[in-house]
Amino acid sequence: MRHGVSGRKLNVTSSHRAAMFRNMAVALIKHEQITTTLPKAKELRPVVEKLITLGKRGDLHARRQAFAQLRDDAVVTKLFSAVAERYKGRAGGYSRVLKAGVRYGDNADMAVIELVDRDVAAKGQDSGPKQNVAEEQEAA
C-alpha cells in the first residue's frame, strides 16, 4: 500500500530525479519559463516554490540551503535579488503550469511552467555554451 507516499517516480532513479529537478529549477529561475512534460512540470512546481520562499527569507542560512540544491552561484544570486524582490508581497503561488498540447514524437502531454509576473526579457538569456570559442581565446 502507498499510504502517504507522495511524488511521481517518472521512471527514473532517485538520483536521476534529483539531478533532473535541480537542472530544471536552475533553468526555470534563469529563463523564468520552460517547456517540459506535464508530469515533470507538476512535480517541479513545489520545488521552485520552496526555493523562492528561501529567497524571500534572504538570510545566509537560506542562501546556503538554496545553493546546496541549485549549485549555481549566478542563479542563487538572481533568486535572492530579483526574484525574491518581485514576490515579497505574495504569499505563495509564484509559478503556474499551462498545458501546451502534445509532443510530436511520442504524443506526451507537454506543459509550460513559468513564474508569475515573469520578466519576458529573461527568456532565452544565456542559454547554452558560447559559440565563439576562438574570440574568447584571443581575449585571454
Curated annotation (Swiss-Prot):
GO terms for biological process: translation. It comes from the Bacteria. Disulfide bonds: none annotated. One of its GO terms (cellular component) is cytosolic large ribosomal subunit. Keywords: Ribonucleoprotein, Ribosomal protein. Pfam families: Ribosomal_L17. One of its GO terms (molecular function) is structural constituent of ribosome. HAMAP family: Ribosomal_bL17. Part of the 50S ribosomal subunit. Contacts protein L32. Belongs to the bacterial ribosomal protein bL17 family. This is Large ribosomal subunit protein bL17. It comes from Gluconobacter oxydans (strain 621H) (Gluconobacter suboxydans). The lineage of its organism: Bacteria, Pseudomonadati, Pseudomonadota, Alphaproteobacteria, Acetobacterales.
